């Protein structure tokens, strides 16, 4: 089997992913909108930022003669007490969870192709690269084309992806406004499937429904609800509850919550999900506390997030979670919050990101620009007062090293196959193995029909590695 190298992380924007580089000085043209937005940034930093004490001390050092898009990371870089607000990227640059961005639309529909690209690129040779499909939104142009999770995109509109052009081709793939042609290679195929192909994607409106996969897996005498959930998005809470209702109607005995691609989102949606999983027996018990700086002028109180009655009640006694280094924020709150109630939570995958803080998000119009602004304003603690997972939550089964399943993948969570394929998805295999209490030989035949997990895929060309600043 041939092996490959994962290259530099793609800096794809998301509200729960650290963002905002600290760049060098510049002399841009300052507009009235810049001044208005910077004043709003300052107001919330001084009044609400979790580390506002230091902001008050040092705000006189902030450089306000710059464009508003650059101001927030520049100001935050003057502080030393805010280590939990983000971290450092692979180039050693300081990045932040706190963000401000232009809010162009509040529509639930998105214009595009419906592809989420895995946050690392692969190299076939010194020059040739590939984008990896992380997941596809249901009913999107990409879904209708037959493109699927784990595919390697090797050309865009007939152009090979190279070090010299990958940035522009990635922009075309993510932000294109017309039809697009992609050539792909497929890692795992059935006997009658081609290992490569070409698709043309139309550009039209679709919904970014974060419930990207849901099914009930028959595992001997057990019925396992398997839910792949990519974001705690309040606009799609109804779709989440529909999936859980289907689990309830199927009388599932166990549940696997796949959060490996989920960087967080709305606390209320996480509250609803946890409430539905545990059921009415936990109503009124505290999932977490959101603690703010006592000097916060907008809201210095601690918000207590209690479990509540939901229309769906699964009454699970155990939760198996698939996680990764991209699992963060509200996803980690689910794991840590349930453990604070002494619920058994089995974490399979790798250490999570470690975002134990959150934001009070506001949207406001400043001059001619509407912005969405989310500075870190609170820290998360479970019912036992624990919240120290700033370095991430360690897995019970670490798939990147030797473990109890007998299978590992040093490149995890690189997508290998479609959702639900336990013969090739080592994480799903390990999660089912946990449900079967270590009987891996029982788990695989029931689901994938195979006798091993493919952790090294045979590729037509050799992968070699280098790091690229994206």
List the predicted regions and their residue ranges.
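PDZ/PDZ-like domain segments forming the peptide/carboxylate-binding groove
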Residues: 108-155, 159-162, 226, 233-239
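Extended, small/polar residue-biased N-terminal targeting/export presequences
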Residues: 33-130, 179-213
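C-terminal, low-ordered peptide segments at domain boundaries
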Residues: 155-252, 307
């Amino acid at each position: 089997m041939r092996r490959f190298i994962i290259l530099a992380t793609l800096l794809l924007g998301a509200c729960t992913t650290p963002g905002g580089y600290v760049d060098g000085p510049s002399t841009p043209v300052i507009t009235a909108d810049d001044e208005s937005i910077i004043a709003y940034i300052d107001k919330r930093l001084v009044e609400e930022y979790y580390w506002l004490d230091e902001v008050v001390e040092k705000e006189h050092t902030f450089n306000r003669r710059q464009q508003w898009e650059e101001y927030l990371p520049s100001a935050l870089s003057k502080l030393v007490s805010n280590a939990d607000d983000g971290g450092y990227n692979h180039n050693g640059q300081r990045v932040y969870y706190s963000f401000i961005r232009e809010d162009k639309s509040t529509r639930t529909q998105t214009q595009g192709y419906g592809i989420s690209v895995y946050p690392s690129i692969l190299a076939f040779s010194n020059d040739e690269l590939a984008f990896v499909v992380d997941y596809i939104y249901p009913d999107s142009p990409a879904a209708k084309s037959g493109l699927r999770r784990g595919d390697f995109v090797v050309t865009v509109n007939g152009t090979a992806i190279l070090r010299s052009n990958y940035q522009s081709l990635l922009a075309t793939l993510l932000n294109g406004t017309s039809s697009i042609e992609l050539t792909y290679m497929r890692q795992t195929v059935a006997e009658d499937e081609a290992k490569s192909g070409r698709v043309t994607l139309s550009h039209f409106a679709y919904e970014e429904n974060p419930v990207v996969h849901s099914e009930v897996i028959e595992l001997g005498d057990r019925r396992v609800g398997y839910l792949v959930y990519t974001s705690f998005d309040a606009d799609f809470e109804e779709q989440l509850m529909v999936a859980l209702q289907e689990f309830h109607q199927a009388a599932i005995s166990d549940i696997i919550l796949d959060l490996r691609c989920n960087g967080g989102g709305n606390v209320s949606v996480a509250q609803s999900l946890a409430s539905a999983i545990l059921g009415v027996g936990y109503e009124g018990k505290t999932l977490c506390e959101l603690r703010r700086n006592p000097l916060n002028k907008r809201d210095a109180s601690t918000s207590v997030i209690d479990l509540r009655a939901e229309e769906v009640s699964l009454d699970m006694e155990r939760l198996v979670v698939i996680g990764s280094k991209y699992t963060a924020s509200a996803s980690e709150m689910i794991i840590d919050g349930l453990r604070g109630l002494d619920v058994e939570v089995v974490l399979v995958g790798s250490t999570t990101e470690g975002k134990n803080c959150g934001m009070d998000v506001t949207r406001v119009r400043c001059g001619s620009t509407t912005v969405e602004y989310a500075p870190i304003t609170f820290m998360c603690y479970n019912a036992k007062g624990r919240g120290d997972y700033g370095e991430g939550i360690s897995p019970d089964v670490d798939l990147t090293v030797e473990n109890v399943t007998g299978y590992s993948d040093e490149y995890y969570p690189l997508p290998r196959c479609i959702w639900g394929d336990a013969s090739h998805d080592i994480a799903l295999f390990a999660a089912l193995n946990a449900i079967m209490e270590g009987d891996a030989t029982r788990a695989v035949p029931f689901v994938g029909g195979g006798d091993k997990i493919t952790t090294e895929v045979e590729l037509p060309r050799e992968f070699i590695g280098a790091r690229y600043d994206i």
